[in-house]
C-alpha cells in the first residue's frame, strides 16, 4: 500500500487520501505526539474509521520502533522470577505486588478503541484487516452472551443467569472449555492470528474446545490494540473485572456522540424496595439454615461459609434499617415523587449504619454471602442473590470515592429522586422479575407494597466519569464521531481538557445530495409532529400521502424515521385503516423496525433482499430515531436512496430525569465553564438524533441520495443551525419554502440526473474483501501519482524500511502487486500487453425496450465486473477465426531457465512477502507464516530451516529461500549460509 508522511510519521493508506482525510489523520497524530486530548468530527462516509485506524497504528509502530529491542519483547514474554511463581505472588507484600503489576502494565503501550456496540466494533476490526496494519496484535472484549460456547450455559437466555452459572462452573473447575484456555493461547491458531474479533474467537474456541470469553481476557496482555464497548471502559467495575490498566494508554472513543449519556448512566444507580425485601429474605434464609445446622452453613457446596452467625445477624439489621429508612421517606405519590440533593443519599444510608467508615466491610459480607447463595439449590428453586446483588451495585456507585471533594461533587452533580415502585408483570407459570431472575416453584416473597419506592441516584455531569479516565494515567483521549457539532457545548459538558479539535466537511460533491424541508403535505396540511399535533388524524393522513407521493420517484430504498415508537405504531395503524398502507405497498414493500434481536436481523435481511430484487421497485424501512436502525447500520447506495425525517425526537418533556438535567445545566452554567442552557441541551438532544438518522444514507464519496425533513419546525433557523454543517449549508442556499409540487419536480430531476451521472465504482463493490483495491493495481510502485504524493515532508518512505513486518506476523497479504492495468480485454489486445485484470462491459439499454422501473434502476447501473486472471497461467493464441484470445496454460517450472536466469527477490519486505504468497500454495504459505512466528518467538533455527526448505522445495523458488536471510537472527546467519551452500551444491550437481 502507498505510504504518506503525516506529521513526521509514515502512514500506510490503501489509496491516496483526500485532503480532509489527511487533515483528520494529522489531528489524530498531533494528539498522540503531544499527549493531548482531541475532539474530531468527520461526517459519515468520509473514511473516518479507516483514517483513525491507519494514523493511530502508524504512530504506535513508530513509537515501538524507537524503543530498544528488549523492550519490544515486553515483560510478558520473559520467564517469571521464582518469587512470583508461588500462589499468585502470595509471598510478596501487597505494595510490592502492585508495583510489579504496574511495571508489567507500563511495559507495553496500548490503544483502546471503544464504540457503542459490538456491531460497530466488528466493522472497525474488519477495516483494520483490510489495511497494511493487519499484523498489529488486536483483540476484542465481549460478554459471555456472545462468547460462551458451553452447551448448557450458552442456552440460558438471560445474561445474568449465564454469568452466575459460568462463575460457578469455573470455580469448581467443571468447565472443560475454561480448563483448556492456558494451552490454547499458545497454539498456532491463536498465536499466528493477530486480529481476532468476536467471530474469530468463537471459531477458534470451538476448534480448540477452549473458552473464547476467557481466552480473550488472556490475550489482552499481549495485545497492542484492545477493542471494547463503552461500558467496559467507562464503568469502573467493568474495568476491574477485565483487569484493564489505563496507565500510558491511548483511548479512542468512536461514535462519541453517545459518550455523554453513557458517562451519566455509569455514574448513576437505583435501588427498589423489592430489592431490599429480597436481600432481607435471602439473609434470613441463610441465618435459619445456620441455626438449624448448629451455627454452620454450607448450602450444596463443599466449602463452608466464611461468615459467622453474628456477621449475618448484623447484616440483616443493616438491611432492615435501610428498608425502614426508605419506607419512612415522605413522598406525594400523586405528584410522582420527590427530589433531594445528591448528599441526601449519605444521610439516608447512615440511618441504617452504612457509612464511609464501614462500607468496605458491609460490601465484603454481602459479596461473600452472594457467592454462597448462588450455589444453593433447594426444592427446584435456584437462589441467585438478586436482591443482595442490587444492593451491592447500588452501594458501589454511591460510595465510588470518599473525602470532602467527593461529597462536594456529589452535592453539585447528583440528585436523589424518589418515586413510587410500580408492580411488576408476572410471568405465566411462575414469577419473573424484570431483571431476569426467575423462581420456578414458589412465589416471590417480596410483593410490591403500596408504599414501595425506587431510590434513583442520578449523575448529571458526564465529566464526572470522564475525569476518572484522565486521572488513571491515560496518554491521550480522542473522541470522534460524524455528529458531535456544536463542539463547544460537547467539550464543556465532558469537562475534558481538549487541545485539538476538528470539524470536517463532507467528502461528496454538492450535486450528490438533495436536501429539502417539507412543511406541508400534498393536501396542504401542515406537517408538524409536536406532542399536541401527533394524534391529529389529518396530520397522520397527510404524512402518509407525502410518503405515497414520493415513492414513485425514489429508486431503491426509502428510510422513514419517526420520533418515537408510539408515533410509528400510530401511523402504521391509521395508514392501514385508511388504505394508504396498501397503496404504498403496491409501489414499495414496507418493513417496520422490530424490537426483538432475532426479528431485527431477519427483517433487515428481507429488506436488503427486496431492494436488490430487480423485479421490485425498492422497499421502505420505517424506524425510530435512537433505535437500532439509526445507529451504526449502513444503507449505502440503493439500500438507502432517500431518508424522510418525520419529526424532532425530543426527550419526554415531563420525565423527571429530563427536568432535573435542564435544572442542573441552568443552575451550574457560568461564563467560565461555557455550559449550555437546559433548553439548548433539550433541543440538541433531538438534533443529534436526527443527524445520526440522516447519516445512514450517504455512506461513501460516490453515494448519492435525498434528505427530506418533513416537519415545519425544521424551517426554524435555530433548529437548522444544530444540524450537521454539511446539511445546514444546503438549507442555507434555499431559504424559500417550496410547495410540495416543486419538491417532487426537483427531486425527480435530481434522481434522473444521478441515474445518468458517471460516478466511479466503489472499490469494495468490485473487489473481494481481501484483495488490493483496483485503483492500487493501476500503476507500478513508484511510477504513478498515487505513489508520489506525501502529506508533509515531500518524500515516500517504504513502510518495511521503518518496521520489520516479520516481527508482527502478517496473517495475509493482498493481491499480486505486479498488476499493471485495469483496461478491458480488447484494449489490452490492441496494446499487445497481457494485463492481469479483464473488464467485461455490460450492454446498455438502446432505448428500444421498455424503460427500467425505478426499483430496477440500480441493477442497470452496476459497476463493470472485474475478473482477476493470474498472469503466469494465461497465454495469447490465434483461433481458427483469426481472433487473438487469452487461453489458460499449464505452467511447469523450467529448471534450465531457473539456472540461467537468476531471479532476485524484492528488497522491500512488503513486496517480498507478497511475492512469497503469490509463489506458494495456500497451505504452504500458512506453514511459512506459522514457522516464521514460532522462530521469532522461540529462536528454534533447526525447526525453522527445515520448514523453510519444505516450503521452498522447487528450483524456481530457490531465490526466495536465499532472500529469507534477512529474517534470520544474527546468531544463526553463519549456519544459514552453510546450509544454503550445501543446497546450491546439490542443485547444480544435479544439473
Swiss-Prot record:
Where along this sequence does the record place binding of ATP? 42-49
Q: Which GO terms describe its cellular component?
A: nucleus
Q: Does the keyword Cytoplasm apply?
A: no
Annotated compartments: Nucleus
Q: Does the entry feature the keyword DNA repair, yes or no?
A: yes
Listed binding positions for [4Fe-4S] cluster are 148, 166, 175, 211
UniProt region (Disordered), positions on chain: 812-833
Catalytic activity, per the record?
ATP + H2O = ADP + phosphate + H(+)
Q: PROSITE patterns recorded for this chain?
A: HELICASE_ATP_BIND_2 (PS51193)
Location of the Helicase ATP-binding domain: 7-319
SUPFAM superfamilies hit by this protein: P-loop containing nucleoside triphosphate hydrolases
Example GO biological process = DNA replication
- Give the location of motif DEAH box in residue numbers: 254-257
Enzyme Commission number(s) of this protein? 5.6.2.-
The protein's matches in Pfam families, at most eight in alphabetical order, are given as: ARCH_RTEL1, DEAD_2, Helicase_C_2
This entry's Gene Ontology molecular function terms read: 4 iron, 4 sulfur cluster binding; ATP binding; ATP hydrolysis activity; DNA binding; DNA helicase activity; DNA polymerase binding; metal ion binding
**What keyword terms does UniProt attach to this protein?**
4Fe-4S, ATP-binding, DNA damage, DNA repair, DNA-binding, Helicase, Hydrolase, Iron, Iron-sulfur, Isomerase, Metal-binding, Nucleotide-binding, Nucleus
- Homology family: Belongs to the helicase family. RAD3/XPD subfamily.
Q: What does this protein do?
A: A probable ATP-dependent DNA helicase implicated in DNA repair and the maintenance of genomic stability. Acts as an anti-recombinase to counteract toxic recombination and limit crossover during meiosis. Regulates meiotic recombination and crossover homeostasis by physically dissociating strand invasion events and thereby promotes noncrossover repair by meiotic synthesis dependent strand annealing (SDSA) as well as disassembly of D loop recombination intermediates.
Protein name (record): Regulator of telomere elongation helicase 1 homolog
- Look up and give the organism this protein is from: Anopheles gambiae (African malaria mosquito)
Tell me the classification of the organism that encodes this protein. Eukaryota, Metazoa, Ecdysozoa, Arthropoda, Hexapoda
